[in-house]
Design a protein with these regions (language model features):
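Hydrophobic/aromatic-enriched cytosolic interaction surfaces used to assemble or bind macromolecules
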Residues: 1-247
Length: 247
């Protein structure tokens, strides 16, 4: 869990505060404790953007119907009665993200801020990677690594064509899933590109293996990925937060 405030793009005025969670209690209970201890949370801010790491269903914007979102989510992903189903519209990506958040967690946030916006943690990453999707003539597949997971994304015709999450425990698992999607999307035919972003595990080993199957792959270096902003060089700040502030 972490908290941040500021505008690093304007003046490098940015405060970043990680919070060590107690895994024996819920996220909501941890947040209640954080409000008692965190100087940042006690600073009197009225508005908050909450990024939730949660399974997310993506619906094309032109097919989205608000009245159907909850039913579709419950038939697609696991849902508990203790959760509220929320949505976040992404006009640039022509999609609506549908996801669930603990009612207790949302209540804690609502009790401390006058205005809140909730979105999936991946939303900032999707928006940032989308900027690369249509640069040049080659088709592109993206793999983003975080928290022992790999998110594989492909954009086509200004929208998502593929988006899925995989457990990334080993180089062989990563390679298997990547090459499966690479072939599924028909990218093994032609001079296409693979982009790797985030905390790439076993980077050298993975790149060595990829050379056998993918002619063009790129590992996005964080500093240059975010135009060498001062915030981008801080390793303790996760990629998704950099994408949110700098993307």
């Amino acid at each position: 869990m972490l908290f941040a405030v500021g505008d690093p793009q304007a003046d490098d005025n940015f405060v970043f505060e990680p919070y060590n969670v107690n895994n024996s209690i819920s996220v909501a209970a941890n947040l209640r404790e954080a409000f008692k201890k965190s100087e940042l949370l006690q600073s009197g801010y009225k508005h908050a953007l909450v990024a939730i790491d949660a399974p997310t269903m993506l619906v094309p914007l032109d097919e989205y119907r608000e009245q159907d979102a909850e039913t579709l989510y419950k038939h697609t992903l696991k849902w508990q009665r203790s959760e509220d189903i929320l949505t976040s519209t992404m006009p640039k990506l022509n999609a609506v993200a549908v996801f669930a958040v603990s009612k207790d967690l949302k209540m804690v946030v609502d009790n401390h801020f006058e205005n809140i916006q909730v979105q999936p943690q991946m939303q900032a990453v999707w928006t940032h990677l989308y900027k690369y999707a249509f640069a040049g003539i080659r088709q592109k597949l993206f793999a983003y690594f975080h928290d022992k997971r790999m998110e594989v994304i492909r954009f086509q015709r200004n929208r998502f064509e593929f988006c899925n999450s995989y457990v990334a425990n080993s180089t062989q698992d990563i390679l298997y899933y990547l090459l499966y999607v690479w072939k599924l999307m028909g990218m093994d035919r032609g001079d296409n590109e693979l982009y790797l972003a985030g905390n790439v595990p076993n980077r050298d080993e993975l790149c060595t293996e990829l050379q056998q199957f993918v002619n063009r792959y790129h590992v996005l270096e964080v500093a240059t990925d975010f135009n060498n902003a001062a915030m981008a060089t801080q390793k303790e700040i996760p990629y998704d937060l950099k994408a949110l502030y700098l993307g």
